[in-house]
Amino acid sequence: MSNSLLSLLNIELPIIQSPMVGVSTPRLAAAVSNAGGLGSIGIGASNVEQARAMLRETAALTDRPFNVNLFCHVPARADAAREAQWLAFLAPLFAEFESPAPAALREIYTSFVEDFAMLEMLLEEKPAVVSFHFGLPPQSSIDALKDAGIVLLACVTNLAEAQQAEHAGVHALVAQGYEAGGHRGVFDPQQDSEMGTFALVRVLTDACQLPVIAAGGIMDGAGIKAVMQLGASAAQLGTAFILCPESSANPAYRDALQGPRAHQTRVTSAISGRPARGMVNRNYIDLETNAPALPDYPIAYDANKALNAAAANKANTDFAVQWAGQGAPLARSMPAAALVNLLAAEMKA
């Protein structure tokens, strides 16, 4: 199988493993790349030296291309009053686990739009592929990465975002449907069109010149074949890889994905401050009922991480972040290379 995107990415199969910060590992990315797909690591939650170490660890495990994903969200606007109100709202939940709420919240991730040290690191390490989530970095950063010979992907959720990415000069579009697990790539969370994968792929392939990578709800070879018949050049799968032994998903996450909760996923902003889809637990109930205004992403996420840590100290996972897409019930447990091989075989069936 060959198409222009596979040639551009220098991969054999139209299978891309989603970056998934907190779940993806260098071992997972390398296994997917070594099997002929495109493995991915997410460095949006890492500082420069952590990110460099992840890149080098992945490169030591594969001589094939892999994708490095960055968060390009609008930097958070601190609002002490709003943050204090949110912590006061969460205080009874912390008390349930005999823990005080944090005194204050932090902006725990630096957006790539203003992280020029991260840009310099990427220009030094030169990964084959870099992808953007939540938006686009400054044009100067895009131009510098392209000049270094790096292939650029942008996650988009509607036509307006796709046209913006196309105009900026990226090489391909990741069309993320509303079915997808994890954070929505939407540039402006207040303007989410909530388009499903199939409709989005058709709209983008009709209106854009760039290759389209379909993402959201795709779990098997039949799904990959379906989106390619709609015009996609490849598919990006995330939830499908969570049960692989190479992922860093913990036992509670793996158990949930193989149980009844996999059948109920929902999008909420209450966990992090930006919309994201996961398996429903108390995050989706207690944090949304009579809640005050949320702090900005990722400041709100700092509160959730503290609450989950307090619960975990009492052996409770009710507030764990367990991202998953609508295809979650179809997740399969096997090594990543075996899954890629199975997906490729299913595509031909």
UniProtKB/Swiss-Prot annotation:
Binding residue positions for FMN: N69, Q176, G181, G217, Q236, L237, G238, T239
UniProt GO molecular function: nitronate monooxygenase activity; nucleotide binding
Enzyme nomenclature, EC number: 1.13.12.-
Note describing how the cofactor binds: Binds 1 FMN per subunit.
Gene3D superfamilies linked to this entry: Aldolase class I (3.20.20.70)
Induction: Constitutively expressed.
Keywords for this protein: Detoxification, Flavoprotein, FMN, Monooxygenase, Nucleotide-binding, Oxidoreductase
Alphabetical GO biological process terms: response to toxic substance
Top enzyme category: oxidoreductase
Pfam families the record matches: NMO
Cofactor(s) recorded in Swiss-Prot or TrEMBL: FMN
Anything else known: At physiological pH, 3-nitropropionate (3-NPA) exists in equilibrium with its conjugate base, propionate-3-nitronate (P3N). P3N is a potent irreversible inhibitor of the key enzyme succinate dehydrogenase in the Krebs cycle and electron transport chain. P3N has been shown to be a toxic metabolite to bacteria, plants, fungi, mammals or any organism that uses succinate dehydrogenase.
Family: Belongs to the nitronate monooxygenase family. NMO class I subfamily.
Name of the protein described by the UniProt record: Nitronate monooxygenase
Organism: Pseudomonas sp
